[in-house]
Amino acid sequence: MSKLVLVLNCGSSSLKFAVVDAQSGEQHLSGLAECLHLPEARIKWKLDGKHEAQLGEGAAHDEALSFIVETILASKPELAAQLKAIGHRVVHGGEQFTQSALIDDAVLKGIEDCAALAPLHNPAHIIGIKAAQKAFPELKNVAVFDTAFHQTMPEEAYLYALPYNLYKEHGIRRYGMHGTSHLFIAREAAERLGKPANELNIINCHLGNGASVCAIKNGQSVDTSMGLTPLEGLVMGTRCGDIDPAIIFHLHDTLGYSVEKINTMLTKESGLLGLTEVTSDCRFVEDNYGQKEEATRAMDVFCHRLAKYVAGYTASLDGRLDAITFTGGIGENSAPIREMVLNRLAIFGITVDSAANLKARFGGEGVITTADSRIPAMVIATNEELVIAEDTARLTNI
């Protein structure tokens, strides 16, 4: 008997959705509503072929979910009839949620309480949850938290060197994100390396418009690059990642930037976009490397930052690193970035197999280092939707 779960991932201006069989892993439907709240709001989906439609000017999450229910699922009533539960990706669960949770009023309030830590994401998740409850009143909803996987980090990894009362009273600490993806990759890597998951040591690089690195020791997160919020760490599409905090005071006190302008700049105008002054698209950076100064500059900074994190995280693994893994839109598809990063890690005895690396794109996976490389590097496609579906099935007993 199938265990079909509707998986929802609400961003500030998007809604990613899928219908996943939690038992077989088969994806029966997938799609994305994007540009929500804007005149060009639209929805794309795969169900018996590829489809696209306009949602109407200014359409929001409610309208997108209504379209999914009344148009997409209505076109395949036998699929809609088999839905058993709904799983939601939630970016921030703070310290309150160390694992996925069946959503009730208390859980919903907890997600709302964490909104200040993920202001671009948690409010959108709440909208999605309430819209799903309205659209499917008979189905149970489960929240799967990005931060939960990282709750195994030791104190020395998650504490900031700030007055300790800021942690005790206000919960200011490193939380990390992309936990669902890091968990899936750890599981997959263990299987491919033929090791028990609880004995696996890897460093996983989840690289997309948002990006993070995670040190995984004996199958558990022991350090990760994102912090209190998704702004810390690597160079990202539009986010700055690590900077000297005093830059903020300089921008405010000396250059006269408002706090709002600084916040917008660091989250939406920095990263690859800031370095190129043209685009946040990694494909532009990759295609024009060595030809255009702005692309070369951005790619060099991106790869330097990533290699530095990977090298540093070896210190958290007690001298044993079983593999370096790449996932996410950039991690799975950018052979040049993977090669540049791994070449910077040659001190660890890593040698890239250029042919294998080129093959591991656009759905290709596998080992991308030579047989004599001391540490293997692998490309593994992430599947956060499956993890969310599995947790939802487990908590709802479907």
Swiss-Prot record:
Top EC class of this enzyme: transferase
Site positions for Transition state stabilizer = 178, 239
Read off the PROSITE patterns from this record. Answer: ACETATE_KINASE_1, ACETATE_KINASE_2
Q: What is this protein called?
A: Acetate kinase 1
Q: Which GO terms describe its molecular function?
A: acetate kinase activity; ATP binding; magnesium ion binding
Subunit description: Homodimer.
Q: Which NCBIfam families match?
A: ackA
Which pathway? Metabolic intermediate biosynthesis; acetyl-CoA biosynthesis; acetyl-CoA from acetate: step 1/2
EC number(s): the record gives 2.7.2.1
Please tell me one Gene Ontology term that the record gives under cellular component: cytosol
Q: Which residues form the active site?
A: 146
Please give the cofactor(s) recorded in the UniProt entry for this protein: Mg(2+); Mn(2+)
Q: Which residues bind substrate?
A: 89
Indicate where this protein resides in the cell: Cytoplasm
Described purpose of this protein according to its UniProt entry: Catalyzes the formation of acetyl phosphate from acetate and ATP. Can also catalyze the reverse reaction.
Q: How is the cofactor bound?
A: Mg(2+). Can also accept Mn(2+).
Keywords (alphabetical) are: ATP-binding, Cytoplasm, Kinase, Magnesium, Metal-binding, Nucleotide-binding, Transferase
The protein's matches in InterPro entries, at most eight in alphabetical order, are given as: Ac/propionate_kinase, Aliphatic_acid_kin_short-chain, Aliphatic_acid_kinase_CS, ATPase_NBD
Please give the CDD domains that the UniProt record associates with this protein.
ASKHA_NBD_AcK_PK
In terms of superkingdom, the source organism counts as Bacteria
The cross-references to Gene3D superfamilies, in alphabetical order and at most eight, read:
3.30.420.40
